Amino acid sequence: MAGAQPGVHALQLKPVCVSDSLKKGTKFVKWEDDSTVVTPIILRTDPQGFFFYWTDQNKETELLDLSLVKDARCGKHAKAPKDPKLRELLDVGNIGRLEHRMITVVYGPDLVNISHLNLVAFQEEVAKEWTNEVFSLATNLLAQNMSRDAFLEKAYTKLKLQVTPEGRIPLKNIYRLFSADRKRVETALEACSLPSSRNDSIPQEDFTPEVYRVFLNNLCPRPEIDNIFSEFGAKSKPYLTVDQMMDFINLKQRDPRLNEILYPPLKQEQVQVLIEKYEPNNSLAKKGQISVDGFMRYLSGEENGVVSPEKLDLNEDMSQPLSHYFINSSHNTYLTAGQLAGNSSVEMYRQVLLSGCRCVELDCWKGRTAEEEPVITHGFTMTTEISFKEVIEAIAECAFKTSPFPILLSFENHVDSPKQQAKMAEYCRLIFGDALLMEPLDKYPLESGVPLPSPMDLMYKILVKNKKKSHKSSEGSGKKKLSEQASNTYSDSSSVFEPSSPGAGEADTESDDDDDDDDCKKSSMDEGTAGSEAMATEEMSNLVNYIQPVKFESFEISKKRNRSFEMSSFVETKGLEQLTKSPVEFVEYNKMQLSRIYPKGTRVDSSNYMPQLFWNAGCQMVALNFQTVDLAMQINMGMYEYNGKSGYRLKPEFMRRPDKHFDPFTEGIVDGIVANTLSVKIISGQFLSDKKVGTYVEVDMFGLPVDTRRKAFKTKTSQGNAVNPIWEEEPIVFKKVVLPSLACLRIAVYEEGGKFIGHRILPVQAIRPGYHYICLRNERNQPLMLPALFVYIEVKDYVPDTYADVIEALSNPIRYVNLMEQRAKQLAALTLEDEEEVKKEADPGETPSEAPSEARPTPAENGVNHTTSLTPKPPSQALHSQPAPGSVKAPAKTEDLIQSVLTEVEAQTIEELKQQKSFVKLQKKHYKEMKDLVKRHHKKTTDLIKEHTTKYNEIQNDYLRRRAALEKTAKKDNKKKSEPSSPDHVSSTIEQDLAALDAEMTQKLVDLKDKQQQQLLNLRQEQYYSEKYQKREHIKLLIQKLTDVAEECQNNQLKKLKEICEKEKKELKKKMDKKRQEKITEAKSKDKSQMEEEKTEMIRSYIQEVVQYIKRLEEAQSKRQEKLVEKHKEIRQQILDEKPKLQVELEQEYQDKFKRLPLEILEFVQEAMKGKISEDSNHSSAPPLMTSDSGKLNQKPPSSEELEGENPGKEFDTPL
């Protein structure tokens, strides 16, 4: 497969994550360069990380789009106030040094026009945290490649942040955001029951995300999506089932170039997860159904991006030699405008490196100030000068902020002062420190035949490309000096002297920037001032190792020298000349060595050549003017947007392998490279312009010369509609893309007058097929918030027309044979020969063996086979004819072959079905319900016992009080007894009263005990009735659930069976194809004419055999399916038969329980009574009857742990 990879890439990109401190906001002081006024603000970031916004003391909110942020700097790298008064204002009353609390946020629409947001934090830690977080958000690759839905959410967030001081959303902001058609906006607002006057405002709570979505649907209706939705099965019903959605994703959205083992099609469970994520109606989602609204959300969601996130991530092998990569390279990096006049800028080095460039150019000249500081400028022009030291500091600051891979510094050294060159070398050593690669790596010595180290080996390293000082004899040096002076007339190549030994650093005049064609005036103009370089001093020469510039002489000489550390630069005209004359040799040269291409000197406007020209030859450092955002620069940005924006892209395999030769001008398919076929249909656009204008779309393809098609397609211009134009035109088809790994598709949108709106550049290899939104970018490759195109893309491996019939016959032989039979019947009326054959076929007296004799091929004449019939044999003849060579003759063998691919499929048993997750989940739920029911009844029992205990205590207290009173009276009476006048009848009366009191107390306790016993019986009966009812319901639900589970599992098994059948057919074809190949191999040993005869016969017989075998296999598969379906019915019936059995068992169980219950309660109370009697006899003189009833029943209900320890089958759960 074209898209197959050795392994599945594990995505390393992190989604946007905004920290709490950024969401809550922090106090800062904002200051301006040109003002002494400072403004206290509260700085925040929205939860999605779209905007950076702040509120001042007047409650006014300002926004900064994080997609415009280039860098965030703090401490010594941040801007510091120059005005002493301003500095004093900022430093008042704050903790920590002012320099450590400074933050500068750099933002702008491009690399040249940048602005600064200057802030001061109140604490150093806060400054560091905000700097790191803001930079992380601004450079997040997933945020730069958001889904369509995320961009619409960004627009919504912008509206929610730009509110009035009262917290309301001004409608003028909505009109301004969707300004293309005011009337449409007004109608859409009214449809949402919102005010529509431009001067109105609405409360934030009235403009919810749901209302916003309805507003968008009214503003930009999408009938084309309704049509797609209907086309895929939602014609009679307002939804797609999970199976229909699965077919849509696997058949339309999946890349057919991917390996099916490493990247299998989505399964039903995975599609169900997607439906649950995007379907707003939960009841539909649970049924596995998705509405048109959910379908629209899926199409605009993160899973349906036009480019896979894996391609954005660092997914290429970074361990190959440096020469195997394209390297993002800049020309005259310091310039901000044209080549002849304008400003040079240190900031350009920062911006270029932050954008992903890995090779920058430094034009160094002698400083003419008293300090003798070297400068960087464009020599002999009106461009300004900048400090060399400041440039080195800027490079050190930003070298590895966005990519860890090596930086290449391309020095164009015109400094003829040894002292200043020494300063340059010293600055490089001191400022770069350990990052500067001073010595070659041990594994990669500077020797012939040794490849360059890899980007992985050189991570976080800076390499210098500069002339290397020679260590030859003084005579040689003298000659070289003369030559060097003469070389001032050269323009961009190297010296005429060639090193005499293979040692490193032998060519101080072997500049990559001297032109060997020095007498050619035009060439000199093309190549600029690079040839006037000064001699390298010892100090600068010592910095050079793996990138040693030499004069290019020929590809043959370079091959003989075989020095990977030597490289040459070519002005674009010279590079084009070499590419035209020796394309294959140029590709070979670039496999081992580096080459750098740069714009010709006549491009004074800083325009660019097309980099694709030189990528096609494998040139690594194709240097462009980054300050000019023309089409060439846009293609360059599109190229290096992928592989983690690392600045390195691995070249196609054929441009790396030493055993393969590649011609960039090839027009045919290259053996070993799978070409692609790409089809693009532009369906519609959304919010393309903020004006009411017509729009159109253009499609280009860039790649090898054979693949490149400029303005290959252009749609019609929509009539005054930029909100939702629909084109629905025929797709543009790129039939054969020879080298897809180096081809890119550009889709651009323009207003009717030709004004550029936006575009997108997509590598062919990374494009996902299917229905997708393409969110547009501006010229600087920054994402636009609202403009998008909706397209349908088909991409697949290319099949030549000549093989289309063979591919069709092999992939679907039955349909192919049926088609051949149909054609035979259509031709039968035109040929007498065919009529005779039909008559013979109808003749009952003809023997089967005679029929095929007429169709046998005659001996070959001059290598061409002749047969008696031009059409395939009718099926009746094919069935009765004798087996052709290579066919399976014996039926037993046929059955053996079929049995070898036929898989045994067993139906799931009831026990296996009961282990299904949904059934087990329901069982657990029922178990919990029964536990809760028992707990409730235990609580009622406890409450009842508490109530009776209280009543008992009251009776006992009353009894004790009355008894105490009587006993007190008895004591008094006893005293009186001692007096002679006291009557005896008083004491007898008191005894009677005490006896009566005891009798009354005993009766009350007996009554209370009887009442307690009855109430306990009632409670337990109530519990049993509840349990019985609940278990009866549980049986119904479990039987129903088991039935549903059985149906679902059986349906899935039948679906799986279809997949198994297809695999079995493929396996059968594979085995038969193996036999066919063996026979073809055998036939190769014979003479050519005989071999051709047998090969033709083999193909014919092979197709017939495959048809017969597949028919037999299908019969066997059909019997297997019938048997499985029968077994499924049997299992479902067994499940239904379980229900009455379980219900009878339940009835019997509770009849027994009810019978035993009164006796159990009585025994229980009596047992408790005995225990309590013995207890009370030791502690109290009161009658113990009531206390006995509170024995065993008056205990806490069992805990959930205790209940879980019980047998659920016996206590709470149903027998099922």
UniProtKB/Swiss-Prot annotation:
Residues 507-518 have a biased composition (Acidic residues). Residues 469-534, 834-891, 933-993, 1071-1095, 1172-1216 are annotated as: Disordered. A lipid is attached at residue 17 (S-palmitoyl cysteine). Residues 316-467 form the PI-PLC X-box domain. Residues 540-656 form the PI-PLC Y-box domain. Residues 656-784 form the C2 domain. Residues 491-501 have a biased composition (Low complexity). InterPro entries: C2_dom, C2_domain_sf, EF-hand-dom_pair, PI-PLC_fam, PLC-beta, PLC-beta1_EF, PLC-beta_C, PLC-beta_C_sf. Palmitoylated. Palmitoylation at Cys-17 by ZDHHC21 regulates the signaling activity of PLCB1 and the function of the endothelial barrier. Palmitoylation by ZDHHC21 is stimulated by inflammation. Its cofactor is Ca(2+). The modification Phosphothreonine is found at residue 509. The active site is at 331, 378. GO terms for biological process: G protein-coupled receptor signaling pathway; interleukin-1-mediated signaling pathway; interleukin-12-mediated signaling pathway; interleukin-15-mediated signaling pathway; lipid catabolic process; memory; phosphatidylinositol metabolic process; phosphatidylinositol-mediated signaling. GO terms for cellular component: cytoplasm; cytosol; nuclear membrane; nuclear speck. It is an enzyme of class 3 (hydrolase). This is 1-phosphatidylinositol 4,5-bisphosphate phosphodiesterase beta-1. It comes from Bos taurus (Bovine).
